[in-house]
């Protein structure tokens, strides 16, 4: 039988769902398109919970019937065997539905539906680290393509031998943060660099930060804390190149965060873009502090988002990508080609199990 806290929550969700369904059918609601859309979205977010709860209730009724048949079939071995099998199958189905309901009722991360800024910084390993940062950029761009997301380069600092010392992408689409938040941390590569004549295996790293996009209301920046200079933006040649100062070099004095933006066409656009990146960076710092508090309580293995956490090692010699949080190996080439869905879904699943265990502990204590 499901825990009482779960049943209470499910009854409450069902009542809310029925009320939203009633309001959608109200002619007055239909007159206000914004209100109608808002209610429809709220109702849609509860649909899977209510459907799963209905299936659970049906399975409970069927189980009562199957147990009754089992009780009455003692004199008929064949009927007894069939009824016993049905009871077993229904009990397994109910267990599965209860676990699914618990997952569906876990509190949603308020940032899950947000677009993101994805920052990759070359770490230890010199030129090879910059090349590795470029490989990660390609991996995430390809993964974004498979998801139907839009990717735009917003800031870059090129490496001397290729790749990037630092690069920031804007990624927009459905559920971007909910999936890519598990990619934050240190990505380590072990391979023979193209720059290495001796053929020795080197270890290099790059750090990935996942920053949900935020508006001015969520993160307020005091203009007095900003120091901004302009510079001439490099270009592909022609009459106007380097004559107009469109590039923006922005410094946030309290944190020392510095952003250089050249990708947009005008100085105003570059300033707006730099402020957008700064807001995302400040929000990510705030989130990280909150997550570290939660992590110290949960001792979570997945999704802490810590920049210093080594999350994955890509070993070229063994054609293996090892995710250290999961303790699992994946085939290297598909991962580098952007086939990240299996890895990310495994991280999501482990995070859910961790949170379910926490929920069970707190419910037992309560």
UniProtKB/Swiss-Prot annotation:
Residue list for modification N5-methylglutamine: 239
Subcellular location: Cytoplasm
Modification note: Methylated by PrmC. Methylation increases the termination efficiency of RF1.
InterPro entries xref list: PCRF, Pep_chain_release_fac_I, Pep_chain_release_fac_I_sf, Prokaryotic/Mito_RF, RF-1
Principal subcellular localisation of the protein: cytoplasm
PROSITE patterns: RF_PROK_I
GO MF entry, a single one: translation release factor activity, codon specific
Alphabetical UniProt keywords: Cytoplasm, Methylation, Protein biosynthesis
One Gene Ontology term, aspect cellular component: cytoplasm
One family name in Pfam for this protein: PCRF
Superkingdom: Bacteria
Family, as annotated: Belongs to the prokaryotic/mitochondrial release factor family.
NCBIfam families: prfA, PRK00591.1
HAMAP family: Rel_fac_1
Protein's job: Peptide chain release factor 1 directs the termination of translation in response to the peptide chain termination codons UAG and UAA.
This protein's name: Peptide chain release factor 1
Organism field: Nostoc sp. (strain PCC 7120 / SAG 25.82 / UTEX 2576)
Gene: prfA
């Amino acid at each position: 039988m499901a825990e009482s806290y779960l049943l209470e929550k499910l009854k409450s969700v069902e009542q809310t769902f029925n009320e939203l369904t009633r309001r959608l059918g109200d002619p007055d609601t239909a007159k206000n398109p914004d209100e109608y859309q808002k209610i429809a979205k709220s109702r849609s977010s509860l649909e899977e919970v209510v459907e799963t709860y209905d299936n659970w209730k049906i399975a409970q009724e069927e189980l009562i019937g199957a147990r009754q048949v089992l009780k009455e079939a003692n004199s008929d071995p064949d009927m007894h065997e069939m009824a016993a099998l049905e009871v077993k199958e229904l009990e397994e189905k109910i267990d599965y539905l209860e676990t699914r309901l618990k997952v569906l009722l876990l509190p949603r991360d308020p940032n899950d539906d947000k677009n993101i800024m994805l920052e990759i910084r070359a770490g230890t390993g010199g030129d090879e680290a910059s090349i590795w940062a470029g490989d990660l950029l390609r991996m995430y761009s390809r993964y974004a393509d498979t998801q139907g997301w839009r990717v735009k380069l917003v800031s870059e600092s090129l490496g001397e031998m290729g790749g990037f010392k630092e690069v920031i992408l804007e990624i927009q689409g459905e559920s971007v943060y909910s999936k890519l938040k598990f990619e934050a941390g240190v990505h380590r590569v072990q391979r023979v660099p193209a720059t290495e004549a001796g053929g020795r295996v080197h270890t290099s790293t790059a750090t990935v930060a996942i920053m949900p996009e935020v508006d001015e209301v969520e993160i307020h920046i005091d203009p007095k804390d900003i120091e901004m200079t302009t510079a001439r933006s490099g270009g592909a040649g022609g009459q106007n190149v380097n004559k107009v100062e469109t590039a923006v070099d922005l410094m946030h004095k309290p944190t020392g965060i510095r952003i250089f933006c050249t990708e947009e066409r005008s100085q105003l656009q570059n300033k707006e873009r730099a402020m957008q990146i700064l807001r995302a960076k400040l929000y990510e710092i705030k989130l990280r502090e909150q997550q570290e508090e939660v992590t110290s309580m949960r001792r979570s293995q997945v999704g802490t988002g810590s920049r210093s956490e080594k999350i994955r090692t890509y070993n070229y010699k063994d054609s293996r990508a090892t995710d250290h949080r999961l303790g699992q190996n994946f085939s290297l080439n598909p991962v580098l080609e952007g086939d990240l869905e299996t890895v990310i879904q495994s991280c999501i699943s482990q995070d859910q199990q961790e949170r379910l265990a926490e929920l069970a502990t707190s419910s037992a204590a309560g």
